[in-house]
């Protein structure tokens, strides 16, 4: 049994993976292509890994959980805040029409650009993720992979009516994972405690 299959079987048993489309997307993307050479032997362990500059590639269970919550559709226009090494966007790109992913750190931005060069439906942008990216809005789904002190208002503004956003909100170290639906009357929010993401830095987030 391959290491990847063993990991995905584990994620299914633990109920992080619930749908065939998310499993298929994770089967199609080699996580080992997005981690440091020295960490390739850990690529299919369920753990976050450093990618440099204080940033990480999320643990596979968190990738699966966020993608399942978003219920991605083949017609979706998706915004990701925090490109990292590009793995999260790569998996999501298998399920949606278009991905815009924003990264503020130049080294990490360049890493994502290199890793995502062959993905023709992913647009990597260097900028302040807390401001979103209005040029490609509105978005059907927004996936935030860094922890914010509050939900940045521009992200709500750029979310389509009926759209979903998943975002860690709390402190610099520990957060709750919020699922936000934008409606004609405002927003509805559900919460899952006990997640840990690197902090979001920006105009509408933490100071550097």
Protein language model regions, located:
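Conserved nucleotide-cofactor-binding alpha/beta core module
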Residues: 71-188
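Class I SAM-dependent transferase core
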Residues: 1-79, 87-91, 95, 108-118, ...
């Amino acid at each position: 049994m391959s290491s990847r299959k063993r990991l995905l079987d584990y994620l299914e048993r633990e109920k992080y993976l619930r749908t065939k489309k998310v499993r298929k997307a994770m089967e199609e993307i080699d996580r080992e292509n997005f981690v440091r050479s020295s960490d390739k032997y850990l690529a299919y362990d369920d753990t976050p890994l450093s990618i440099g500059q204080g940033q990480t590639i999320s643990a596979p269970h968190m990738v699966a959980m966020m993608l399942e919550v978003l219920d991605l559709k083949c017609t979706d226009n998706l915004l990701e805040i925090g490109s990292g090494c590009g793995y999260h966007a790569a998996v999501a790109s298998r399920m949606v029409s278009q991905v815009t992913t924003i990264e503020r750190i130049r080294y990490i931005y360049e890493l994502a650009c290199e890793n995502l060069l062959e993905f023709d439906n992913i647009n990597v942008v260097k900028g302040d993720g807390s401001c979103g990216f209005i040029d490609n809005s509105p978005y059907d789904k927004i996936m935030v992979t860094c922890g914010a002190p509050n939900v940045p208002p521009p992200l709500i503004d750029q979310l389509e009516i009926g759209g979903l956003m998943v975002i860690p909100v709390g402190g610099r170290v520990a957060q709750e994972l919020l699922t936000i639906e934008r409606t004609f009357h405002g927003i509805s929010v559900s919460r899952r405690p006990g997640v840990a993401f690197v902090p979001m830095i920006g105009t509408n987030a933490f100071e550097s």
